[in-house]
């Protein structure tokens, strides 16, 4: 049994892979709280730069020399933090263990933060980042000054982390490796449950078992009544629903859903409190927003404050994120990497086309999907569902599969996925490498189109590639 984690401000803390979206958020909170924070990451990122501005020391190399450097001139041995993305063969991790330093998983440090104050931990297969971002933004607007540790950049804060002075901490509880069972929040929120992360969960029952352990650790649970798995398999103290006839404690009955946003009647325990107006399209976003409002109400925020703040909300980074205009096309980036997420994102985009209303600068003529499969295991598990979801686009470009360190599986590739889309009667092509994506986008899209870039790998770099190509050709882009 590992020793319980307890930190004081004198304890140096070192993050291996500090530029990651989850690691950098925790590091940022500690830096803001005047801890001696160091980190390493070979990739430079906006998160790494922000940490430097907060006083953290960030190394670009990951090797034994970094461990020597952080151990030099300190009175206490540094605590070393890693995520599941760091392999045991990482040379810096090997050096840390060789030096006898204590090494903990990021979830242990996050649990220490969550368990130390009133907290809201947002779990679930989809919508965690959006929902936790909305909760933090709404609590901030309501004057409750929350601390936030989010898996995406929150527009209201310009960061994935915020160190507030209020009693509430909002954190995203990632289920991908099962480590969320370490958390004991005051309020556990579960957005939905669906099989994913098949590298860790062999079946849905295994995922449900983990979520039961998590919910059992929560003082109170708020869950989505509209999710059939949650309704059947888990118990909750509070439920939310978009269904008019539901018995859920918190309801938002849709009045209008179009490409420019959502409107719904809001009810608590059957009593109508007013109308919610959300400037984000998609039924999934209305569910996320209702969950956020419900959580904030349980945290003590007034409905009037939440109602007003909701109209100004913006989704977090990489969630239908408008990067800019390129040769008359709108380029939008999204983190969707599961079939349900791809389907929801493309459905939202096509709603803008069909309704003639859009949150974007103009109503798109067509939707061109650029999708990068993420992990061989996930692509193999959901090949048919990915093909079905991508069929919602007018054109499909499949970028090279991002392995995330997994070994190849025979018969699983971007080309195989493109063939599946074609077999269903839709236009699709696979790209051999990332360099060919720019030409493919130019060939398969036209001025007025929406180019929707989806994936959890490096496909988000397409925008910078498009900008570079425009600079080389003397063409205009608008960010």
Curated annotation (Swiss-Prot):
Pathway: Cell wall biogenesis; peptidoglycan biosynthesis. GO terms for biological process: cell division; cell wall organization; peptidoglycan biosynthetic process; regulation of cell shape. It catalyses: UDP-N-acetyl-alpha-D-muramate + L-alanine + ATP = UDP-N-acetyl-alpha-D-muramoyl-L-alanine + ADP + phosphate + H(+). InterPro entries: Mur-like_cat_sf, Mur_ligase_C, Mur_ligase_C_dom_sf, Mur_ligase_cen, Mur_ligase_N, MurCDEF_pg_biosynth, UDP-N-AcMur_Ala_ligase_MurC. One of its GO terms (cellular component) is cytoplasm. Its EC number is 6.3.2.8. ATP binds at residues 124-130. Keywords: ATP-binding, Cell cycle, Cell division, Cell shape, Cell wall biogenesis/degradation, Cytoplasm, Ligase, Nucleotide-binding, Peptidoglycan synthesis. Its main location: cytoplasm. One of its GO terms (molecular function) is ATP binding. It is found in: Cytoplasm. It holds the Pfam family Mur_ligase_M. Belongs to the MurCDEF family. PANTHER family: UDP-N-ACETYLMURAMATE--L-ALANINE LIGASE (PTHR43445:SF3), UDP-N-ACETYLMURAMATE--L-ALANINE LIGASE-RELATED (PTHR43445). Cell wall formation. NCBIfam families: murC. This is UDP-N-acetylmuramate--L-alanine ligase. It comes from Synechococcus sp. (strain RCC307). The gene is murC.
């Amino acid at each position: 049994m590992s020793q319980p984690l307890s930190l004081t401000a004198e304890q140096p803390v070192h993050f291996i892979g500090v530029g990651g979206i989850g690691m950098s958020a925790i590091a940022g909170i500690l830096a803001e709280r005047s801890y001696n924070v160091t980190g390493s990451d070979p990739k430079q990122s906006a998160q790494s730069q922000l940490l430097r501005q907060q006083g953290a020391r960030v190394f670009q190399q990951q090797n034994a020399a970094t461990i020597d450097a952080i151990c030099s001139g300190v009175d206490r041995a540094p605590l070393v933090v890693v995520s599941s993305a760091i392999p045991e063969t990482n040379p810096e991790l090997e050096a840390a263990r060789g030096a006898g330093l204590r090494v903990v998983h990021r979830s242990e440090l996050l649990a220490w933060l969550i368990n130390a104050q009133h907290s809201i931990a947002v779990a679930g297969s989809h919508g965690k980042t959006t929902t936790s971002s909305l909760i933090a933004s709404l609590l901030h607007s309501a004057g409750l000054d929350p601390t936030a540790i989010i898996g995406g950049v929150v527009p209201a804060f310009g960061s994935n982390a915020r160190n507030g002075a209020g009693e509430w901490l909002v954190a995203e509880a990632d289920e991908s490796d099962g480590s969320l069972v370490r958390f004991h929040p005051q309020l556990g929120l579960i957005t939905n449950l669906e099989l994913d992360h098949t590298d860790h969960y062999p079946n849905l029952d295994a995922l449900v078992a983990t979520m039961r352990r998590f919910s059992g650790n929560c003082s109170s649970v708020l869950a989505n009544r509209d999710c059939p798995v949650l309704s059947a398999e888990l118990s909750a103290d509070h439920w939310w629903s978009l269904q008019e006839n539901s018995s859920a404690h918190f309801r938002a009955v849709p009045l209008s859903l179009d490409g420019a946003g959502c409107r719904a009647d809001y009810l608590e325990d059957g009593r109508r409190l007013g109308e919610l107006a959300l400037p984000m399209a998609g039924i999934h976003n209305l569910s996320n927003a209702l969950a956020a409002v419900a959580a904030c109400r349980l945290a003590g925020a007034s409905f009037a404050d939440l109602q007003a703040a909701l109209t100004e909300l913006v989704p977090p980074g990489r969630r239908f994120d408008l990067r800019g205009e390129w040769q008359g096309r709108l380029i939008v980036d999204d983190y969707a990497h599961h079939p349900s997420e791809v389907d929801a994102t493309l459905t939202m985009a096509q709603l803008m086309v069909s309704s003639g209303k859009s949150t974007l600068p103009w109503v798109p003529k067509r939707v061109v999907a650029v999708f990068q499969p993420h992990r061989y295991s996930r692509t193999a598990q959901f090949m048919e569902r990915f093909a079905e979801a991508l069929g919602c686009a007018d054109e499909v470009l499949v970028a090279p599969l991002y392995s995330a360190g997994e070994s190849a599986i025979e018969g699983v590739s971007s080309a195989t996925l493109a063939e599946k889309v074609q077999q269903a009667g839709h236009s699709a092509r696979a790209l051999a490498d990332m360099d060919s994506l720019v030409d493919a986008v130019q060939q398969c899209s036209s001025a007025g189109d929406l180019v929707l870039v989806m994936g959890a790998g490096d496909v988000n770099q397409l925008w910078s590639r498009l900008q570079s190509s425009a600079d080389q050709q003397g063409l205009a882009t608008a960010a």
